[in-house]
């Protein structure tokens, strides 16, 4: 059987305990099941056969209960009950499970559960919030970095001054001969000058394009072939020859009619002419030549 008074006299009443921490003001207890963290008779988990406490494991709160019936079984000494994440429901669970426990233990369990929930909420807020990470540096490293920065600034100022001087001399045309200057700065100055000239030429081209806006031009059709043009020329020639034939036939008919009228007038005598005089048109004669291929002589065998 477990005797609480005997255990307390041996452990807590000015005797040795492995969980006890002595200070000038009071004594503390390092046992994980201690409900208050103080070393006294009412809060000692070893000297109380009916005991309860609250523990947190990986963000989840559990209620641990100990009864005298399980004192003979150390493997089943503590009964664990998982508490709800809702604060009010968890308090109701504590009241339901600790009906027959002392009021002091019930009150301290609720108080411990409140503290645990508060620091869990604070942990969640800190994890979501960004924090500054302070990295300590030695004095030697700081001095070295400052010297490097100063040297880099001086070198940058010197390079800028050299570039400005090169640009001024290049504009003035002072480089008739070869000089021993930094090649990179000289090349950079030349590139800047080339960029400026290229921008001017592009501006001139844009002005020319603006001037050409609104002009009208005739463009040859790419779909017309030379064979089509030759066909059109042949058609024109045929049309011209047909017109000439018509004109020649008309002129011949008119001349024959005039001759007949003249013969009639001579036979009847002179008669007064009526109407307008008919003027004779110039007569055009057209001759056509046909070329025939000469017959080849038969070879005498």
Curated annotation (Swiss-Prot):
* One CC-aspect GO term: nucleolus
Entry superkingdom: Eukaryota
**Which is an annotated Pfam family here?**
Ribosomal_L28e
Its GO biological process annotations read:
maturation of 5.8S rRNA; maturation of LSU-rRNA
Key word Coiled coil present in the record?
no
Biased composition of type Acidic residues is found at 202-212, 219-234, 251-261
Which cell locations does it reside in? Answer: Nucleus, Nucleolus
Basic residues bias (residue ranges) = 265-282
What ranges does the record give for the region Disordered, renumbered to this chain? Answer: 191-301
The family annotation for this protein states:
Belongs to the MAK16 family.
Put simply, this protein is called Protein MAK16 homolog A
Question: What species was this sequence derived from?
Answer: Xenopus laevis (African clawed frog)
Q: What's the source species' lineage?
A: Eukaryota, Metazoa, Chordata, Craniata, Vertebrata
């Amino acid at each position: 059987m477990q005797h609480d008074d005997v255990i307390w006299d041996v452990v807590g009443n000015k005797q040795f305990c492995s969980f006890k921490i002595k200070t000038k003001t009071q004594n503390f207890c390092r046992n994980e099941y201690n409900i208050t963290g103080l070393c006294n008779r009412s809060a000692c988990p070893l000297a109380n056969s009916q005991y309860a406490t609250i523990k947190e494991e990986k963000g989840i709160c559990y209620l641990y209960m100990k009864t005298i019936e399980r004192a003979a079984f150390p493997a089943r000494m503590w009964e664990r009950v998982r508490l709800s994440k809702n604060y009010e429901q968890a308090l109701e669970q504590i009241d339901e499970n600790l009906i027959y426990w002392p009021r002091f233990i019930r009150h301290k369990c609720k108080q411990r559960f409140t503290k645990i929930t508060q620091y869990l909420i604070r942990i969640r807020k800190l994890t979501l919030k960004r924090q500054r990470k302070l990295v300590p540096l030695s004095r030697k490293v700081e001095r070295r970095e400052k010297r490097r920065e100063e040297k880099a600034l001086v070198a940058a100022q010197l390079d800028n001054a050299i570039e400005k001087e090169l640009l001024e001399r290049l504009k003035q045309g002072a480089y008739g001969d070869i000089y021993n200057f930094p090649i990179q700065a000289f090349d950079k100055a030349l590139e800047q000058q080339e960029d400026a000239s290229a921008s001017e030429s592009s501006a001139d081209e844009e002005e020319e394009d603006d001037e050409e806006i609104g002009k009208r031009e005739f463009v040859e059709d790419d779909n017309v072939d030379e064979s089509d043009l030759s066909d059109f020329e042949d058609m024109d020639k045929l049309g011209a020859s047909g017109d000439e034939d018509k004109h020649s036939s008309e002129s011949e008919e008119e001349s024959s009619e005039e001759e007949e009228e003249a013969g009639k007038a001579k036979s009847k005598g002179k008669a007064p002419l009526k109407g307008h005089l008919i003027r004779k048109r110039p007569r055009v004669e057209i001759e056509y030549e046909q070329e025939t291929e000469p017959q080849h002589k038969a070879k005498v065998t």
